[in-house]
């Protein structure tokens, strides 16, 4: 995204005293917020809240999370899911025959390097758009590109991540038979990912209900002063400055208690083909899967 790229080109900030750099970060967050609100206001004013994209952007502005129902048809989603599962067949199973957490395994697909993360019965295969033209087309339609332009001020293409989590019912050599019965979760702790407004999309390849682990979001949490401290700390740490107290990426227990009282915690259940949009300043986490399987495709920007 545009602001992220600008920040990455400002290493000189690391050479400044912390007392000088901190106010700069406060101003960056302030102006990002101001122009983000302005962009959404103009789009909604022109196209209205009855427009699917307009409604989604309006919901994002208010709560930090939105769902566009039936963004993809059942046939389209089934094709995507089939292709995702097909990629599991190409994994180096001998390297996956372990009970240990695999954080960042390099795997080759058609000469391209992809990354794999596995924890228990959950796998993330990262970089599917590098594999073939089928995946490269995903997330490049007009509606998705328009949302990306409004939110990020650029035409960047999504980084695709396939995530499968199951209770043992999904039989495949990519999952060792010796796993414990507990279902561990990748990204299972409440956290915020960004200090400036940035989107992540979740495409539901199957229905995601209470039993198979929906993403949990704290509505309006990004607008709370307690969480804004986390946003500032993320920027401080990005430029190698000491963070203020209260946490940065992860939300500590004290703030969680605060959120339970002040924010509306929702389990973002979605149907197959729905597209969930999440502002990464919002506190969220992956809830434990109780039974069944969960297949989702993440779009990272």
Regions found by a protein language model. Give the residues of each.
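Short, structured patches in soluble enzyme cores that scaffold and shape functional sites
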Residues: 175, 192-194, 203-207, 219
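A short hydrophobic beta-strand segment most commonly corresponding to one strand
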Residues: 201-203, 219, 292-301
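Histidine-centered catalytic micro-motifs
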Residues: 187-195, 283-286
């Amino acid at each position: 995204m545009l602001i992220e790229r600008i920040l990455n080109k400002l290493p000189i900030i690391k050479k400044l005293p912390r007392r000088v750099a901190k106010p700069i970060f406060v101003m960056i967050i302030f102006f990002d917020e101001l122009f983000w609100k302005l962009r959404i206001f103009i789009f909604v004013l022109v196209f209205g809240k009855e427009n699917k994209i307009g409604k989604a952007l309006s919901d994002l502005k208010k709560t930090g999370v939105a769902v566009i129902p039936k963004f993809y048809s059942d046939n389209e989603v089934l094709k995507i899911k089939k292709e995702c599962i097909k990629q599991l067949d190409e994994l180096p199973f001998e390297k996956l025959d372990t009970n240990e957490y695999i954080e960042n395994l390099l795997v080759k697909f058609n000469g391209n390097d992809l990354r794999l993360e596995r924890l228990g019965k959950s796998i993330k295969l990262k970089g599917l758009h590098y594999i073939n033209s089928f995946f490269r087309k995903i997330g490049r339609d007009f509606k998705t590109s328009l949302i990306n332009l409004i939110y990020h001020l650029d035409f960047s293409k999504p980084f695709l991540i396939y995530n499968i989590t199951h209770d043992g019912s999904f039989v495949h050599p990519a999952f060792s038979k010796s796993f414990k019965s507990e279902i561990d979760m990748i990204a299972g702790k409440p956290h915020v990912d960004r200090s400036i407004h940035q989107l992540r999309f979740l495409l539901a390849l199957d229905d995601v209900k209470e039993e198979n682990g929906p993403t949990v979001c704290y509505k309006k949490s990004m607008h709370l002063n307690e969480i804004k401290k986390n946003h500032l700390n993320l920027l401080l740490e990005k430029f190698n400055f000491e963070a203020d107290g209260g946490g940065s990426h992860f939300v500590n227990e004290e703030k969680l208690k605060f959120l339970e009282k002040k924010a509306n915690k929702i389990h973002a259940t979605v149907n197959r083909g729905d597209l969930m949009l999440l502002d990464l300043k919002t506190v969220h986490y992956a809830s434990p899967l109780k039974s069944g399987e969960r297949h989702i495709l993440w779009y990272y920007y």
